[in-house]
Amino acid sequence: MRYPAMDFAFVLDPLPLLKAYKDSSVAMMRAVARRGHRVFAIEQPALYWRDGATRARAVPLTLHADDHDWYSAGAPEDRALKDFAAVMMRKDPPFDMEYVYSTYLLEAAEREGARVFNRPRAIRDYNEKFAIAAFRAFTAPTLVTRDAALIGAFIDEHGDAIVKPLDGMG
């Protein structure tokens, strides 16, 4: 059974910054396109709310297999987020105020009937790097701190460590 084509929106980083060969958002967009659906890219500055509706200047994409020239962009379309089959929040950190404001707009879109994946409140309230604290039985020795002395002592104790910012990519 063939279903009618649907429109999927992806809120993400600027397209030229995405590395198609390793970016999971690109893989998701390609999977959507392979199934005959339409893909739209939305950058954070393109999100807005007006007169009771969360909207965006959404850019339609044609996706290509070539990882270096992986998309062609059409002219931006002004669209209500609730009119998409799904809105995927795929923006990478930094977790700054623009990110927070984007989650507020996406939450408003949910209230208007949009289907937003990566729930705005959840990604705002639940830090992905600190989430491991809920699964202590499955983690290596872990330290979360901003204190350089504690980090040094932790490395001395364990020999090496992976150090990542809570609010950035890495």
Where are these regions (language model features)?
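Active-site nucleotide/adenylate-binding loops and adjacent lid/helix of ATP-dependent enzymes
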Residues: R2-Y3, D7-R34, V39-G170
